[in-house]
From Swiss-Prot:
It is a multi-pass membrane protein. The chain crosses the membrane at residues 27-47, 70-90, 98-118, 139-159, 178-198. Belongs to the cytochrome c oxidase subunit 3 family. Keywords: Cell membrane, Electron transport, Membrane, Oxidoreductase, Transmembrane, Transmembrane helix, Transport. This is Cytochrome bo(3) ubiquinol oxidase subunit 3. GO terms for molecular function: cytochrome bo3 ubiquinol oxidase activity; cytochrome-c oxidase activity. Residues 48-69, 119-138, 199-205 are extracellular. The lineage of its organism: Bacteria, Pseudomonadati, Pseudomonadota, Gammaproteobacteria, Enterobacterales. It is found in: Cell membrane. It comes from Buchnera aphidicola subsp. Acyrthosiphon pisum (strain APS) (Acyrthosiphon pisum symbiotic bacterium). The keyword Electron transport applies. It comes from the Bacteria.
Amino acid sequence: MIENKFNNTILNSNSSTHDKISETKKLFGLWIYLMSDCIMFAVLFAVYAIVSSNISINLISNKIFNLSSILLETFLLLLSSLSCGFVVIAMNQKRIKMIYSFLTITFIFGLIFLLMEVHEFYELIIENFGPDKNAFFSIFFTLVATHGVHIFFGLILILSILYQIKKLGLTNSIRTRILCFSVFWHFLDIIWICVFTFVYLNGAI
C-alpha cells in the first residue's frame, strides 16, 4: 500500500511537471508568434506613415471618418480587455461559471467592435473611398483590416474555449489556452490603441 501511494505520488509529480513544461512551451511559441506579428504591424505602420506624409490633404480630419464611432469602438475593445482580465482571475479561482460569463462578455464586445469596423469599411466603400481609391486608402484598409482579421480569429478562439470547457472542464490544457488567449487579446488591444492614436487621433489634429 505504501509502495502504491509512493508510485502515485511520483506519477502525479511527473504529470504536473509535464503540464508545466507544456504550458511553458505553448506560451513561448505564442510570444514568438506575437513578435512576428509586431514586425508585420510595424511594417504596416511605417508604410502608412510614408504614404500619409506624402499627401497634401488630411483625409482623416476631412470629415471622411466618423471619429465618434471610432472612439466608441476603442471604448468597447478596452472593455473587452477588462473582461478578458477577469477571465484569468476567475480561472485562477476555478470559477467556471464566471469564466463562461466573462468570456461571453469579451466575445460580445469584440463582435460589436468587429461589426462596427465592417460597417465603417462599408460606408467608406459606398462613398467611393475604397482601397482602390489611392495609396492612402489602400494602406489604411490593409492596416485596419489586418487587425480586424486578428479580432475575428480571437472570437473563434473564444468559442472554441467555451466549447472545450463545456466538454472537458477546466483542464490544465484549457487553462493554458485561456492564458494564451488572454495574452493574444491584450496584444490586439495594444495594437488598436496604436492604430487609434497614430492613424485616427494623430490624423484628426
